[in-house]
Amino acid sequence: MAIKIRKLDSTSEGFAAELRAVLAFEASEDDAIERAVAQILADVKARGDAAVLDYTNRFDRLNAASVAALELPQSELEAALEGLEPKRRAALEAAAARVRGYHEKQKIECGSHSWQYTEADGTVLGQKVTPLDRVGLYVPGGKAAYPSSVLMNAIPARVAGVGEIVMVVPTPDGLKNDLVLAAALLGGVDRVFTIGGAQAVAALAYGTQTVPAVDKICGPGNAYVASAKRRVFGTVGIDMIAGPSEILVLCDGTTDPSWVAMDLFSQAEHDELAQSILLCPDEAFIERVEKAIGELLPTMPRQDVIRASLEGRGALVKVRDMAEACRIANDIAPEHLEISALEPHQWGKQIRHAGAIFLGRYTSESLGDYCAGPNHVLPTSRTARFSSPLGVYDFFKRSSLIEVSAEGAHTLGEIASELAYGEGLQAHAKSAEYRMKGAGDRQKG
């Protein structure tokens, strides 16, 4: 059966509206899910371990006697790594090493060190940078088991110097994924609990008798997990609420069309709502990509998901030239942006908004997903206009440092008291003036 993908032309009169229709996505809030999540959060907050145990046994069809029994010992993570097929273990270890190397470099470059300077009057100003004390990592279980996500979330936290990393992962019917457990070991996870869903998010946010409360929760999950993360934000920090995965390919028509087709598939196979778009100035090349899609789709194990994604949210777009493609890309602000062209750096300089930029025909998005090194946790749904990939900087916090000298107390006090009186805050003004007087008396003495 032929696949039907939208084909747009940027020179057509209705192009802007057509593109908006392709991009339109708004995460719907299911009232039933919202009510269920609110109840679970309240229950875990009130009953702690007992509630977590009840929900876990019910939803994952387990018969655990306690939450403590749901914690995995480090020896089980070690056994999972040892039990991997050698080639797969080597791949996982290589990916972990590359991700760690990139984030160690990022730590040096991203302003992760405290700093200060001294003014002429002896006043010291600066900033103290400290890692978070404890971070929670949510990892999906069941069919959607992604060891790469464990590495991408755990390693930057560990490189940042987070005190403790607590991972939660559901194990429906008691089934554990050895790749996920091995990734937890390689990523430096300290504790692993086999719990999931909104109850796991609640346990991490509020703490229970067994599960420690964390300062920030990271990691992907289903609609219940996303709703729970949204609701606990403020009690704890969160990484982001991710939407469907996206790829935008800018191609000048010089890449093998089957490569481009497979790159579009690489996001479409995630789920039916994932989005894959091609922008190209060469109409004949677009037709060749369309032909490659038709030929390659039947060979894909997840062809039904890919078809639904491409037909529902995909597009092949003819643009005037690569410069226009860059302008459109900046408006879309995609999660993943591939520039598959002879001169990728020329066009890359024009990109301002993208979660990750993949330069050149040999740089497939999938390499970034697994092992290139940069983080694959990226902003979606146009949030790349103001958001960044997950990184070591997400696991630091900054405190301002102020140490005022006696002379500085007089200089700054005059400014502060004047502004405080202007705002009608007399105690603020007096607080500054007392120190002005105290500093003056000390200097006289």
Curated annotation (Swiss-Prot):
GO terms for biological process: L-histidine biosynthetic process. Keywords: Amino-acid biosynthesis, Histidine biosynthesis, Metal-binding, NAD, Oxidoreductase, Zinc. Its EC number is 1.1.1.23. GO terms for molecular function: histidinol dehydrogenase activity; NAD binding; zinc ion binding. The keyword Nucleus does not apply. The keyword Amino-acid biosynthesis applies. Its cofactor is Zn(2+). Pfam families: Histidinol_dh (PF00815). Binds 1 zinc ion per subunit. Zn(2+) binds at Q267, H270, D369, H428. It comes from the Bacteria. CDD domains: Histidinol_dh (cd06572). Pathway: Amino-acid biosynthesis; L-histidine biosynthesis; L-histidine from 5-phospho-alpha-D-ribose 1-diphosphate: step 9/9. InterPro entries: Ald_DH/histidinol_DH, Histidinol_DH_CS, Histidinol_DH_monofunct, Hstdl_DH. It catalyses: L-histidinol + 2 NAD(+) + H2O = L-histidine + 2 NADH + 3 H(+). GO terms for cellular component: cytosol. Catalyzes the sequential NAD-dependent oxidations of L-histidinol to L-histidinaldehyde and then to L-histidine. Belongs to the histidinol dehydrogenase family. This is Histidinol dehydrogenase.
